[in-house]
Amino acid sequence: MSDPLADYTNLSHDEIDPSSANAAESEQAEPEQQVSEHYEPQPEELTYENDENVLNSIKVQKITDAEAIGEVVRKKVIRDSRPQGYQQDDFNDNSNVTLGSRPGHQQTDEIDISSMDPQQRKRFELEERMSAAIKPSNKRRRKADEDDLERMQDDKIDYLKDQMIKAANSDVEKNSQGQIATEKLKLLKEVSDILARADLAIPILDNNLLEAVRLWLEPLPDASMPAYQIQKELIHALETLPIKTDHLVASGIGKVLVFYQRSKRTEPSLKKIVDRLIGDWTRPILNKSDSYKDRTVQFHEYNRNKFTNKLSRGVKKREAKTLYEENAERRKRAAIPSTRTTAYKIAPQVDKSLLMRQQSRHASNDERFKRINSKLTSMSVKRKAAKKGGPSIEGRDLAM
């Protein structure tokens, strides 16, 4: 006979007490829930199976991981863990809302992704990669060593300025002692190379290298001018620099160029450049326009008696000779005359009535000349025809 209690003795503890089984299940569920709340998937666990399809659908190119790390500016992300005092219900209201899905929602620089589940985080990473691929890359990035490069340029200009000042002072001392001043000529090539560089134009002006240029262009203690090569290189270099009024005040180079403009020993070709530079520098100071439409021309009456008296006296102003002409005169050789352009500053006044009378007189003379010319032309044609043909056999055109 079978035991009636055998079926009950073989039951497990859960089957005997269902309430205890439910309690045990709840105890096991709570740590699993805590683990899921604090669980953060690692980057290698995220799979992007549909990335290629999504990127191909919007016709963009997928960037590489190196480009995403090195060149793409990513948003600052806070990955702080959620405080334990919060409950899961506090995050359920916005758990299903993705970034940018609500109307009027604006993305901020700081985004907390700790409240996102793995699916939302995966979507967020994909949106960032897509926005980085679509974003135009024509924005100029500041170089990491740009500040160091500017500092190096400033140090280079300061060092050259000190060398130029020392060379100028040394030449002044040698000239006062009656020696040959050659320190500036030794340093001229280096100075010309620096002044010719367009990328150093702003550092040259900011570090006031024009002050050293002024010292090089100043006359020596014995009233002699600097070497012609120094004048030529430095004055030509001043044309390429964007010199403003502040730079002129700080360096004082304008006074030296005014001396070169008024001096008779300045080479004519250099004097033209100096005149143009002084005109360009003084125009904004005097509030004058560089347009020829706004240019004012001085007019003066022509004095015939004054001109005839000057011719009768035979006084002719001697023009400044060039270095080539001076060398030829010193060697007692002939020099090829050079062409020179004359610039007039005063325009003569014109009498319109006198011009009209002259035009009418010329018109009457032209009519008389045309009539005489046509008559002479017809006579010459007849003479040529008579000489060529002669009298005919029948006696036509025969003078009796």
From Swiss-Prot:
Its main location: nucleus. Residues 1-50, 77-149, 375-400 are annotated as: Disordered. It holds the Pfam family Med26. Residues 119-130 have a biased composition (Basic and acidic residues). GO terms for biological process: poly(A)+ mRNA export from nucleus. Residues 84-99 have a biased composition (Polar residues). This is Transcription factor IWS1. It comes from Candida albicans (strain SC5314 / ATCC MYA-2876).
